[in-house]
Amino acid sequence: RVLALSAGDEVELFLNGQSLGKKPVGEELALTAVFQVLYQPGELKAVSYKGGAIQGECTLRTAGPVSALRVEASRLALSAGEQDLCILTADLVDEQGVMNLWEVKPVTVRVEGAGTLLGFGSGNPSCSGSYQDLCWDTFDGRVQAVVRAGKEPGPLTVTFSAPGCSDAQVTLLVNPSDFR
């Protein structure tokens, strides 16, 4: 069962390029179209129409085996002085960059330079580790680290590693603080 939410007039659902038909949406239907779909790996795309014109679309793809870590940082520059924080998210992705939510891998974090690791974890509600641990199993394909800028300016490099993946690294710039 696939639920497609849209503020348009109707939604068309495609499975691996084949249309599964259009269904109406609207306030009387709680802006939701319901499709009965047999699972197939590949691509599922919903296209929203309003007045016959495409209003928007959303695509989901089946993830393949994990081949890499993808890291995103909440910011790339911090101010020295031990007040600024950055949240780094490391996701397990396949060769096409699709996040794999199902595979579990232990991920290790290493922090070098002008800052420190404040905490590291996966968000798994049933885990028993400490946020000070340097290795966590992914949960829903993800781990997160929080780093804090140090007292002095300079580069702050955060490296994530997992079995079967190349290391993923982000270098943040810790700038001199404006406060004295």
Residue ranges, per PLM feature:
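Edge beta-strands of extracellular beta-sandwich domains
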Residues: 52-64, 166-175
